[in-house]
Amino acid sequence: SNPSQLATAAGARFILQGTILKDPETVKVSTHLTDVANGRQIWAEAYTHPLEAGRLFATQEEIARSVVAAIGSEYGIIARRLSAEARKKPPAELDTYEALLRYYAHQISPSVESIQQCFTALERAAEREPEYGPVWSALATLHCQMYAVDAPGFEESLDTALRFARRGVLREPGSQLGRLILAYASYLADDSESFHEEIETALTLNPNSPYTVGTAGYFHIMRGEFDRGLPLLDRAIAANPCHPNWFHGGYVINYLRQQEYDLALLEVQNHSPYLSYWLPAAFAAILGSVGRIDEAKTYLEQVKEQKPDFGSRAHELFRRTL
């Protein structure tokens, strides 16, 4: 039987194949991924490394990490393909795995529409499988985001986020997502000890997950821990170009810290890393810093339209995001 027939017999949706070629100086690994459902090749890559006896195992590990990040990570080609299929179904009809795919799609590019769809899908999943920890962790993330933007109707969002995040870890102690989200909720709650404990646990569970590494880097930067955060963020973005837009918010903060306002502005323009009124707020702050006052005022008006009490609560609201 050919590999596709074997994959079909085993119930596999995707099959990874490859070849290894070498000469006295180099080794080349060519690999490709096929969707068994239609027989189409959906990803291919070639890796060339010097052929050094002392680095054979290191080379194997480097290639394996690259392949896993490209196809099997939270934002790898498999997750993106399945997520695209799940988007064709109404949120209330998604199964638990599809609900989590919808959650990860929302994390790449959050919007009001996507967060509503996530709430619907994940709440249904929690009703069906209340013992499945990652669903509670994903719901905790949404409540963290509602707290960060001070969304109306979510006055107890931080308490709910902490409760759901702890429930997720209790039900699935080895879940990297669970540990990561408990770190997020702990960060928002100013619990530094819990934040550092959970973020390091998340990284230890799988140090090769681009999403976890990048999120950890982002949180460290938000806490002012740039020496720890920036290398993690750089590593995550280099490993997977399909990373969430909000990762770039870490670079915005770093550029602002260094008073490199033009670079901060480019990050915001190119990646729109903020949700809700925080995007025009970022534009207003940066443009004001470079003397483009009229443009800054225009964005500030957008902030006031979306969040009328922003002026009187700016310090409190900034604390929820920075």
Predicted features, each with a name:
Residues 118, 165, 182, 196-216, ...:
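Alpha-helical protein-protein interaction modules
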Residues 1-117, 121:
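Catalytic-center loop of serine/cysteine hydrolases
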Residues 103-115, 140, 144-152, 189-190, ...:
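Short coil/turn linking the two alpha-helices of tandem helical-hairpin repeats
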Residues 114-131, 156-172, 194-202:
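Amphipathic alpha-helices of TPR/Sel1-like and other helical repeat/solenoid scaffolds
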Residues 122-153:
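Short, charge-rich amphipathic alpha-helical segments embedded
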